[in-house]
Structure formats: structure tokens, C-alpha cells
Amino acid sequence: SGEHAGCFGWCMFDYATHKDFGSGDRICYHGVMDGFRNPKLAAALYASQGEQPVLAAGSGMDIGDYPAGQVGTVYVFSNADSVELYKNGALVTTLRQSPWASLPHPPLAVDDTIGQLLETQEHFGRRKAAMLRDCLLAAGKYGLPGMPLRKKLKMLLCMLRYKMSFSDGVALYGKYVGNWGGEATVWRFDAKKDGKVVSSVTLKPSARLHLEAHASAETLQEGDTYDMVAVRVRILDENGNVAPYAQLPVHFCVQGCLHLVGAETTVAEGGMCGTYLRTAMQ
């Protein structure tokens, strides 16, 4: 209507609720953080509107997470001047433009994971690379049977003009779109500010997980009553990324003049959980 002064998102964190809401366990899970204030991916959109360096990829880039192995458009949340995308160490593209220009630092869309690779890796000319890239991306998006007629005709023209066989196209598709077999694909996002890399995210298949625990305070001080601290726990891979499918049990054990507030054993949800500790008033 043009009369809105602003808006805010609901809500900051997950919370316990009553019998009429929740997800079967009376927890509302629509926070941008979980109940222990571990940030979910959505929190990166809000954090990126500030000035402290932020970089988060909206996907783990795992083809097994998507129908037909097609990752599709991925959104990157950052407040950098630009974000560079690398595949196995080779520069794919540089992200700068966004359709949401009204935001101070809008999300950046990755809808082309081939970029300049056909030129730098296959040494194709610019026109040939652009034509092939368009055809390969269309095949990935629609599937060969579902490709629009104009894309099929473009593919045929490309084969005739550059004397390519169908098997040549299949090989390029497997290498640059399908990413099946062969060595594991390593994706890297580098956020640059004033020409310097300020944040970097590396995504690759991983089975080496570890726990990260962060306390909301380093010192507890009793006054008229006990003091309390929140302990946030995340399950991370070797590159510091949350393992979102790690629904693993986490056991807490306390020694000394502290009491555990909550269950001794909990289960990580989305690779995250937490607990609270309080002083014993001794």
C-alpha cells in the first residue's frame, strides 16, 4: 500500500510454546537462532546488514541434497564488496550484483557454477565458451528432455559450428554440471573488502567432525543468588561449517562448584545444541 514504515521478522529464536503450536514437542522452531542462541542460516541475512565481516553460503553444495543432483540457485549472504567463487582452486566468477538493491548488503545469487572455467580450463574461445555454458546450464536446469526448444536448437547449432559430438557434450556436462564421480569437488567463497579477503568459506565432503563449545561468559559471580552461563555447542567439519545432518547425542558432565541446568544428555538438532550451568552457592 506504500504506507508501511518498516517491518521485522518473527522471530529471533526458537521457544517453548503451548499445546496448540509447536512441532509435536511444543517447540516453535521458526527462530533465526535456536533456543540456545546458536545462529541458523537465516541469521546470516540479518548479520550481513551490519559492518562486521559476514560470509555464509546458503547451501552446502552437496548434489545429493537436490533432485537429480541439481543444486540450482544458491544465495550468499555477505557485507563485502564482492565475493569470489572458486571450484577446486580455479576462479569461477565474481559476485557483485543483486536484485535486492534496497538492502544495505543484499544477498548475492549464484546461478552459474561454470563461469569462466570453460575458458581457463578447456581453453575455449569466449564466444564458444559462452554458448556452451548457456547450453550446459540449461541442460542442468531443465534436464535434456525438458529443455526449451530454443535451447535445444542452440545446442544443435553449437555442435554443428564447433564440430562437437554428443559424447563431447556429455563429458563437459559431467565435469562442470553433474559433478558425479571423480575427485571430490571443493568449493570456496572468498569475501573481499577494499581488495582484501576478509572472510572465506570452504565447502567439501567431510567426515571429520568435532565439537565446538562457547560459553556466554568466562567468569561467574554470585551475589544474592546464583549466577548462570549458557553453553552453546555446535558440531563442525574440518572447515568450520556446521554439520546440519549431525543429529548426534551430546553428553554433559560437570565437575567442581557448578550445577548442570537441564538434561545430562541431549541430541543436536541441525548440528547444534546447548545447555546451562549455574553456580552451586557454596
State the predicted function of each range.
Residues 119-130, 178-195, 233, 282:
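Short, aromatic- and glycine-rich surface loops/edge beta-strands on solvent-exposed regions
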Residues 204-224:
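Low-complexity, acidic Ser/Thr/Pro/Gly-rich terminal tails and inter-domain linkers that flank the onset
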Residues 74-78, 227-244, 282:
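Beta-strand-rich structural segments
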Residues 94, 196-211:
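Edge beta-strands of extracellular beta-sandwich domains
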Residues 63-69, 219-229:
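Short, solvent-exposed loop/linker segments at the N-terminal edge
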Residues 30, 90-94, 247-257, 263:
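Short, well-ordered beta-strand segments
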Residues 1-171, 195:
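Extended substrate-binding grooves/exosites of carbohydrate-active enzymes
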Residues 103-112, 256-275:
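Low-complexity "stalk/linker" and mucin-like segments enriched in Ser/Thr/Pro/Ala/Gly
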